[in-house]
């Protein structure tokens, strides 16, 4: 009998450049994300968390240094994964390949400097498409691939579904 194993890893995506202010990100969304995931890590021994964007880690380091130290401890024990490779999530359709490459370089350099670990993929959870140059950029950056959660936007309506 063939058995298969599925691995699920929790993640959070914070848009620091979209619909709310940096102050909201720093004062509301970062503390909420950290406290909930710190609690889950402590409660569940197999819980692992992916968090992306070196810029958000810089904000944590600046505004919540004790939490940043806790993240470092979790990274060392493989409970927390600096994900995504990029400094900041952004569009990958319009910017030049050079801009995307530098974004990856800045992000992974930060991860290595702070955690002695680099991300192995580019995490694009909220893009409105993926440019044709992306596979070459990913390959040239030495990444294994990319992860996403949104392959289309608004193409499926779930309004007819009801909860039990």
What residue ranges belong to the model's regions?
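Short, solvent-exposed turn/loop segments enriched in Gly/Ser/Thr/Pro and often Arg
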Residues: 50-60, 86-88, 122-131, 149-155
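Short acidic, glycine/serine/threonine-rich loops at helix termini
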Residues: 61-63, 132-137, 158
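Acidic, His- and aromatic-enriched active-site or binding-groove loops in soluble protein domains
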Residues: 67-82, 135, 139-155
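CE4/NodB-like, metal-dependent polysaccharide N-deacetylase domain
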Residues: 100-133, 137-140
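Conserved small/polar residues in nucleotide/adenosyl-binding loops
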Residues: 159-164
